Amino acid sequence: MAHKKGTGSTRNGRDSNAQRLGVKRYGGEVVRAGNILVRQRGTKFHPGNNVGRGNDDTLFATIDGVVTFERYGKDRKRISVYPVAAAAS
């Protein structure tokens, strides 16, 4: 067994914190205005009706309502929030 660590092992041992990205509110969930819907890098999901986009591409609800995931175009997804009364009918 070596009594010295060796140069490689002493230089390792670093890791960055997780960014906690992903969908935070799923389709059919009732949300309040300002709730974060998705944290993402780039626009995997695009903002739809009543959804805003932050500087870091985070999508958030601008009104109280129900979350819906929609497809549009050939290969794009968008997230919209519709008022609860409209979603019930």
Curated annotation (Swiss-Prot):
Segments for region (Disordered): 1-22
Pfam families per record: Ribosomal_L27
Gene3D superfamilies referenced in this protein's UniProt entry, alphabetically: 2.40.50.100
Comp. bias (Polar residues): 7-19
Listed GO biological process terms: translation
Keywords linked to the UniProt accession: Ribonucleoprotein, Ribosomal protein
Protein name as catalogued: Large ribosomal subunit protein bL27
Organism of origin: Cyanothece sp. (strain PCC 7425 / ATCC 29141)
Lineage summary: Bacteria, Bacillati, Cyanobacteriota, Cyanophyceae, Gomontiellales
